[in-house]
Amino acid sequence: MGANEDQEMELEALRSIYEGDNSFRELSPVSFQYRIGEDGDPKAFLIEVSWTETYPQTAPVISMNAFFNNTISSAVKQSILAKLQEAVEVNLGTAMTYTLFEYAKDHKEQFMENHHPGNSATPVANIISVETPTTAPSSKKKEKKEQLSKAQKRKLADKTDHKGELPRGWNWVDVVKHLSKTGSKDDE
């Protein structure tokens, strides 16, 4: 049997085994993803297996570069990939995609024992702020400007000059008007 015939048989088997399984996804006839763990599980991860042209005589390409795995540290990812690579070497020459997915499911706790959700991986935003100079955080704390409606902006523009400043003396008290309201000392 040739490599293409083996691949076609394995593809048919995978489709029938994982029919209706939300964790399994066929990206292409030679590339598959499987989510190990339930939805919302902080220790869940995604494995992508891509077949080469000579698969199963040669090893498939195993990847954990999916966005789903961004919370997992690179050390844990490398550890998982190394253990999966050992399983590949044992099964070389046979259809192994199903075997790899099941191996990962069976050893999930062992794979993720060094993974501490929330602590192990730094989100991309933190990586960027760590690499930028210390002056960057102060620029991020700019005050939010108040959102004004068109009418409010127009009213404000009518009261202010071209720089947005109120004219000199806008809050001055009209002395004559003020004195006429208060009265004189003689009236007392």
Swiss-Prot record:
Pfam families: RWD (PF05773). This is RWD domain-containing protein 4. Disulfide bonds: none annotated. The gene is Rwdd4. It comes from Mus musculus (Mouse). Residues 155-166 have a biased composition (Basic and acidic residues). Residues 132-167 are annotated as: Disordered. Residues 9-111 form the RWD domain. PROSITE patterns: RWD. It comes from the Eukaryota. SUPFAM superfamilies: UBC-like.
